[in-house]
Amino acid sequence: YKLSVNYFYKGLDLLSIPYELKEVPFEDYSLRTLFFKTTQHPKGTLFICGGFDALLEELYFTNVRAALEEGYHVILFEGPGQSRAIRTYQKNFTPRWDLVVEAILQSYQEEIVSPKFGIGLSLGGLLIARASALNEHLFDKVVLYNYFPNMLDSFKTNIPKILHPYLKSQF
């Protein structure tokens, strides 16, 4: 994990790709975020989070370059249960993802250009949808792709069907 993270930033530096790595205070620890600023007149700000086993850095390859070329600022973020938060601080996922997003937005007040887009990949789609349902003022628009609507349904695809009734009855 640490090697992949270190090599990612070495790669950005070697390619002279500007970025700002920022620690955002949250509860009794901090969340890593990564800010990329477009060189164009900004059309808005994209807030992107990944899913269950996502690393903050892997989100660069799915969205950042294209978004910057299209004129958007990009803020990648992780929350409890992801990346460093789980590996270093042993912080599990929270059902209150709206509080995670609020902390990120608060920390980036000066950099945000509206409209604000919340983008969630995989389980991140569920997290962004949940945050937006709990606080409709977080984002102007929400984009969910490779959406992961239900952890249990996903789990069930990997176990024999004979065991499915036990999952429904919660043993």
Task: Give the ranges of each region predicted by the language model.
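Residue in the alpha/beta-hydrolase core beta-strand immediately N-terminal to the catalytic nucleophile
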Residues: E78, P115-G118, K141-V143
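Hydrolase active-site cap/lid region
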Residues: L134-F171
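Active-site glycine-rich loops that stabilize anionic/oxyanionic intermediates
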Residues: Q40-K43, I48-L55
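N-terminal cap/lid segment of alpha/beta-hydrolase-fold proteins
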Residues: K2-G44
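The serine-hydrolase catalytic nucleophile loop
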Residues: F52-R65
